[in-house]
């Protein structure tokens, strides 16, 4: 009998489930499959940009996922004539000189139309469209500046996917040209820096636009700032590689690493021109690169706070420019929230909180003179937006010009 009871107890013990308490609870983040940041970015863009751009989104989408097209910004401090000859040998063309040719043709046609309409007694249609006198003057001055700019940037024709070789050093040790998204020059051209101007580049690194500002040879003084010390170091390297020491003395170029939002208090009403090329979602980078991707889960809050940061930086830029001066705001994002909405919000904040009144400027003339190089979106409330396209895979690049009213 005792043996039978022992046998039954062993069978019961063997069949019972025993519960074991683990030291740590498993986290969902370690058990669920990890989604790449680039995939998260694509999902986000599909959800938002498909509504923003409608039927245009599939074309933009495939262009963003395809290799970007580059332009070659010629270094005016190098042996320029030799560089122009070498780049022309690649069957590349300077898109700025092409735009200057378009401006000349439009001006000739406009003069002919004006003469004919004055003879027939009809109203004249100006090259810059149906605008009031102040807007006509501003647009005419901008076109005149485009006609006389010293910037030169080569690009391959539409549909040509050739790539420029890496730049070589000249006899002075300076690199001959700088490879960059050609659309990144549009904010610099829109800024319209004139001879003797003091200029602030509020978010300067990695340095392409800063270098372009110096290539205009119009900056009497250039302040280049970026919050990141590592990115500021890269900016230093870029300028050392392209600009002679005599052109980047502390009296001509000052590189700082400060919070750009404080610039409005530190140097209010100081500069003739201010470029505010803000941190953004960098749409193309977010789709193609995992490293330093703003769609990483640990950067979710940072991404959500971007429009606020952008508006604060733009307000600082508007305060730093003197009355009568101009500010250009730019991003490399397609997002309305980071583009038009930020501009509109910053204009309101500058007026209500600081008594700084500004007026957005019409840049529609850029669509006309650069239409052979870039694809522009027609639906912006303010500013202009370059859309990526497979035949001309530049951008995205949004830029908006603001005039501080005296």
From Swiss-Prot:
Intracellular or extracellular location(s): Mitochondrion
Catalytic activity: a cytidine in rRNA + S-adenosyl-L-methionine = a 5-methylcytidine in rRNA + S-adenosyl-L-homocysteine + H(+); a cytidine in mRNA + S-adenosyl-L-methionine = a 5-methylcytidine in mRNA + S-adenosyl-L-homocysteine + H(+)
Stretches that traverse the bilayer: none
Cited InterPro entries: MeTrfase_RsmB-F_NOP2_cat, MeTrfase_RsmB-F_NOP2_dom, RCMT, SAM-dependent_MTases_sf
Signal peptide residue numbers: none
Enzyme Commission code: 2.1.1.-
Record key words, sorted: Methyltransferase, Mitochondrion, RNA-binding, rRNA processing, S-adenosyl-L-methionine, Transferase, Transit peptide
rRNA-binding keyword on record: no
Pfam families: Methyltr_RsmB-F
GO CC list: mitochondrial matrix
Active-site residues per Swiss-Prot or TrEMBL entry: 332
One of the GO biological process terms: mitochondrial RNA catabolic process
Gene Ontology MF annotations: mRNA (cytidine-5-)-methyltransferase activity; RNA binding
Ligand binding (S-adenosyl-L-methionine): 207-209, 226, 231, 259-260, 277
Sequence similarity: Belongs to the class I-like SAM-binding methyltransferase superfamily. RsmB/NOP family.
Function: Involved in mitochondrial ribosome large subunit biogenesis. Mitochondrial RNA cytosine C(5)-methyltransferase that methylates cytosine to 5-methylcytosine (m5C) in various RNAs, such as rRNAs, mRNAs and some long non-coding RNAs (lncRNAs). Involved in mitochondrial ribosome small subunit (SSU) maturation by catalyzing methylation of mitochondrial 12S rRNA.
Record-linked PANTHER family: 5-METHYLCYTOSINE RRNA METHYLTRANSFERASE NSUN4, NCL1 YEAST -RELATED NOL1/NOP2/FMU SUN DOMAIN-CONTAINING
Record's protein name: 5-cytosine rRNA methyltransferase NSUN4
Protein species of origin: Xenopus tropicalis
């Amino acid at each position: 009998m005792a043996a039978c009871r022992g046998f039954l107890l062993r069978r019961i013990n063997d069949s019972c489930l025993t519960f074991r308490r683990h030291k740590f609870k498993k986290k969902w983040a370690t058990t669920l499959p990890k989604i790449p940041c680039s995939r998260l970015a694509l999902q986000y863009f599909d959800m938002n940009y498909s509504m923003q751009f409608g039927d245009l989104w599939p074309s933009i989408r495939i262009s963003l996922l395809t290799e970007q097209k580059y332009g070659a910004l010629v270094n005016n401090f190098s042996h320029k004539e030799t560089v122009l000859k070498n780049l022309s040998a690649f069957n590349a063309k300077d898109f700025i000189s092409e735009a200057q040719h378009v401006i000349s043709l439009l001006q000739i046609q406009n003069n002919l139309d004006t003469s004919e309409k004055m003879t027939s007694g009809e109203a004249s249609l100006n090259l810059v469209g149906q605008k009031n006198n102040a807007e006509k003057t501003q647009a005419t001055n901008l076109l005149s500046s485009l006609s006389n700019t010293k910037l030169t940037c080569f690009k391959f024709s539409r549909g040509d996917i050739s790539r420029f070789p890496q730049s070589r050093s000249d006899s002075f040790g300076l690199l001959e040209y700088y490879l960059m998204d050609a659309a990144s020059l549009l904010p610099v051209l829109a800024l319209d820096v004139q001879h003797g101007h003091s200029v602030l580049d509020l978010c300067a690194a990695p340095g392409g636009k800063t270098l372009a500002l110096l290539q205009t040879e119009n900056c009497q003084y250039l302040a280049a700032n970026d919050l990141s010390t590592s990115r500021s170091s890269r900016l230093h390297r870029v300028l050392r590689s392209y600009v002679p020491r005599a052109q980047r003395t502390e009296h001509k170029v000052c590189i700082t690493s400060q919070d750009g939002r404080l610039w409005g208090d530190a140097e209010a009403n100081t500069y003739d021109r201010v470029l505010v090329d803000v941190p953004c979602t960098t749409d193309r980078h977010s789709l193609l690169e995992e490293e330093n991707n703003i769609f990483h889960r640990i950067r979710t809050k940072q991404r959500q706070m971007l429009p606020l940061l952008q508006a604060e930086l733009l307000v600082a830029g508007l305060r730093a420019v003197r009355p009568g001066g101009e500010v250009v705001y730019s991003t490399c994002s397609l997002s309305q929230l980071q583009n038009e909405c930020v501009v509109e919000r910053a204009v309101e904040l500058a007026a209500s909180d600081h008594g700084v009144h500004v007026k957005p400027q019409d840049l529609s003339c850029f669509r006309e003179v650069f239409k052979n190089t870039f694809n522009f979106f027609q639906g912006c409330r303010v500013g202009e937006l370059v859309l990526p396209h497979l035949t001309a895979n530049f951008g995205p690049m949004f830029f908006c010009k603001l005039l501080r009213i005296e």
